[in-house]
Amino acid sequence: MKILVINCGSSSLKYQLIDMQGEKVLCKGLCERIGMESSMITHEANGNKATTPAIFPTHTEAFAEVVKKMTTGDGKVIDDVSEINAIGHRVVHGGEKFQASCLITPEVIETLRELSPLAPLHNPAGILGIEAAKKVFGDIPNVAVFDTAFHSTMPPKAFMYAIPYEYYEKYGVRRYGFHGTSHKYVSYRAAEYLEEPIDRLKLITCHLGNGSSIAAVDQGKVVDTSMGMTPLAGRMMGTRCGDIDPSVVNYLKYTLNITGHQLDEILNKKSGLLGVSGVSSDKRDVEAAAAAGNPRAQLASDMLNYQIKKTIGSYIAAMGGVDAIVFTGGIGEHDADSRAKICHHMDWLGIRVDTDKNANAHKQNKDVVEITAWGAKVRTLVIETNEELMIARDTKEVLGNEGLL
């Protein structure tokens, strides 16, 4: 069976067509600048990759161009869209309504609209993608896979905020967590690599990139995660502040005489590595500046590594131990120096990485590389995440549960 995986932004459409027999990517691509001038599509298939100009007034036209690329020319991988068995959509926020992936119905779409205030930048774009896909692909089943779903196993003591309880009851104010699809994929891949059932493992998964989150996964269930009601919470990120004293918000608002929207822009887009270093939101640029003697860049790097280390320690305490630490995401997979600094002085917890294995992990050309030092009790893994494949797997599972296979 073939599943089309979709990740829609307000002006973009990312896609992969996966043949589930062998879990092979047949093609992938990106439609950019939807609704703007100079729209374009990049399509990769059969060893060819090409970017061509296009006209995308809406996501519907973008999907139509994706179909054209998949069925004609050098990028052809199918004869007709009828060969596609289902479409899996990444949806950022499922709130408490959706604790697992589900078949998309008109009722589901309406509920997603109701949840849009929880993710105003992401859920409306996801709905646009779903509705456009239904127009272009007709009766092909559509499945929603939620970033928040894997974290829905958190107990109330982990997800509740210590504010009046009625705000949770009336407005859904609580910790939800994000990057769930990535955390789920690397958790199961770690269990597979370790040759242990996931329900016997205590894992800490670190998805580190421009956006970063950490999850404590005990026996296959998330018991805590670093992001909160929104992806702004948790560890500092490329441009996001992460956890700060809530009183700072009001203090800055009145001191700077700015609106809530302006403050939101500062905390989401001008903070984190960029705000502290004054150099860049990209960890590589920050590290280069630090190496050149920039003290603020060094501070930003030290802060991030320290915060991640502190979170790992707290999650070990929460779970009463840990079997493996997993690094994934752009920083987690490629930044050996950060991995080394995060794990430094954690020998007393049984965590120690091999210097050579860590430094050469990127050269192994494997989706899982173990960097555990000899004698360390806790295994340390670098795992290449694959959110698209996880979405495809969830989509296939939903079809099976609905009797549509």
Feature locations, PLM:
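Extreme N-terminal starter segment of soluble prokaryotic enzymes
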Residues: M1-L4
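Short glycine-rich, Thr/Ser-proximal phosphate-binding strand/loop in the N-terminal lobe
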Residues: S12-F56, G228
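Phosphate/pyrophosphate-binding loops at sites that engage ATP/ADP/AMP, CoA/4′-phosphopantetheine
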Residues: K69-I84, A190-P197, I312-D323
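Short beta-strand-loop/turn "lid" adjacent to the catalytic site in phosphate-handling enzymes
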Residues: M70-H122, V143, A149-A158
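Glycine-rich phosphate-binding loop of actin/hexokinase-like ATP-binding domains
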Residues: F150-Y254
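Catalytic phosphate/nucleotide-handling subdomain of diverse soluble enzymes
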Residues: D218, D224-L256, E265, G329-H362, ...
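Adenine-nucleotide phosphate-binding core of ATP-dependent small-molecule kinases
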Residues: E265, G272-V276, K283-A318
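Internal helix-turn-beta structural module
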Residues: Q298, D302-A318, G332-L405
